[in-house]
């Protein structure tokens, strides 16, 4: 029997503890990095906003370029060793930047400092692309059953949201009182704690997966190149209607959330009449809603199932976002933002067991490596599109429908809510309830038996056999998880 203080199991508890410490360290690091760039490296410069945005661009490039191919290697490698190796790499990178930052700011040109910052962020995010699918796969091995997997996802979500609330308030005092170096060293130390926690997790050694997932496991894994394994992962994903459905409504929903993330600062100050100094309360409201949703998610999934939870959460959150777009007061807006984040976090939690069960063990790394870059790309496109619409095409928009007035920002956010509603309607049809649909196979739902959900390999491969919608949190600038 597991100890009373365990979360699901002792091994999962140790894995969670490492994530908790590392997440707080990431938030401290990301907030510190933004403060350092904005107030020191680019202080009083006209290009300061561009310098700050470069941090986001560096992280996004790593996700889009490294993310898809990382899953191939994760499926090949030992998952626990992969996680340990990435923690060593990330801790070393942050520690190295911390040591260099002991130099006076004027010791190096601003361009050199920014190159060091962007390079570090890019490498941290690149390493995280290996860490995330490896952790995803280990959780699948440690936690079984839809309810427990949903509970594990809920705990993970709650931990991330808590770090979002705790990290930034820690970062500012560290930065302004002790300096950027000590805030960075705090993050490096968090990677060390995570390394120790992960090294104590006991994971049964897995058999090396064949490159094409055919299950024969002979020598083709050595003959197959990375590209072939990557294509095999894409083929597996594309032949699973269930996985494609998950990706489609995740991307549609991400368009809605991405627009909110981009324009929320303008909505709260212009439509809600809130002072920019109070914008921190928006992040706190999102964090509170995320924690409540994460804590409720496991029970909700247990009651109505992961599939029904997914499409219901999309419909509810979409309707709440439309309602949020009509608010004109600070209190009402904050309350609706909390309520909106709750079902969205429940949605993220419900999707975890669906992904875990839909992907065969040898493809889990590649499934995650397809999912994350696509949703990241959707978020980037949504941010660019919504910003362009608000600043150009709809800048002077002023209309009314049935006595309700619409301006540019609230109109875009309302359309974003409709996108999430559309995603929910699509999910309702694409993810039928288990009692009304038979799962299995590449065109069905999650694999319930060995080989379910795997695509039939082409003849030449059989002859020679050889891989989530984010809560509207303030951008984790520089975060690597």
Identify what each model region corresponds to.
Residues 79, 466-469:
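Compositionally biased, intrinsically disordered low-complexity regions used as flexible
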Residues 1-449, 454-455, 460, 479:
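Alpha-helical transmembrane-bundle signature of multi-pass membrane transport and export proteins
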Residues 470, 476-477:
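Basic polycationic patches enriched in arginine
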Residues 466, 479-481:
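Soluble, non-transmembrane alpha-helical interaction regions
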